[in-house]
Amino acid sequence: FNTPAPDLTHSYSYNGRGELAADAMSRGGTYSYVYDNIGNRVTSREGSGASAAAYTANSLNQYTAITREEEAPFAPGYDADGNQTKIQTSTGEWEVSYNALNQAARFIQGNRRVECRYDYLNRRIEKAVYEGEVLMSKKRFIYHGYLQIAELDAADATESAMPVLRKTYLWDPLEPVATRILAMSLFDETGTYVEDLYYTHDLLKNATALFGIRAGRRALYEYGPYGNILRMEGNAAEDNPFRFSSEYADDELGLVYYNYRYYNPQNGRW
């Protein structure tokens, strides 16, 4: 921002099937990928000094082994419906269990667990994070259609105490499908309005920065080609969950929630 030349540039190259083969960045090195004939990754190397990763896929195009240099091989797990029950993300390994509708209901990592509830339209309406039996946070989500328009703190909610409004969101009305987020309003722990923040985006709909009316730039984001965070800074950076592709980032899980399914930037898969 306010520089005569871009601070970061991406130069993309593709193979004969139109798959991303390399992203040469002006800062951070090159991300490179090799695929099999069906489009599964065979190898990847993401950035300068990064270790290479090798992938093994079965006849159902499910990864059955992911091996990174100097790390023990990781073996993803699946249930009979094809849901992935063992995942590896930027925050570590998680065991995932699903409800009868094949919705991810519980994520477990050691003493930590994340529990999710959904409504009849398959929208996630609640996310609770526990350390052992201690509730660390509980968020409830309000939607207009499939666009999240509000987030409430329900950690202390009871029959007599309502959840507290913490965030509201404004979306681009000119793009009803695959839209982008335009603004976020923040509220304090009592539900009192604090401020509005406004988004800038790149051409891929990724949120690149947040600006306040008085305080200037409040957050900055940079991404790898498959959505991993390369740079995130600013005193409002973590307040904003809508980053890559203007979708909701679950920081605890290292996943991105796309309403119908979760995306894992670490291996570029849903």
Name these PLM-found stretches:
Residues F1-P6, H10-Y12, G16, A22-G28, ...:
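Beta-turn initiation residues at beta-strand->coil junctions
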Residues Y12, Y33, A53-Y55, A75-P76, ...:
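A residue-level detector for well-ordered beta-strand positions
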Residues V34-T43, H144, L204:
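A surface-exposed, glycine/aromatic-enriched loop/edge motif typical of exported proteins
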Residues G49-N58, T64-A65, E69, P173, ...:
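A motif-centric feature for acidic-aromatic and gly/ser/thr-rich catalytic loops and repeats
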Residues E115-K127:
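Transmembrane beta-barrel strand/turn architecture of Gram-negative outer membrane proteins
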Residues I142-Y143, I149-A150, E159-R166, R214-N228:
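Carboxylate/His-rich catalytic cores and anion/metal-binding grooves
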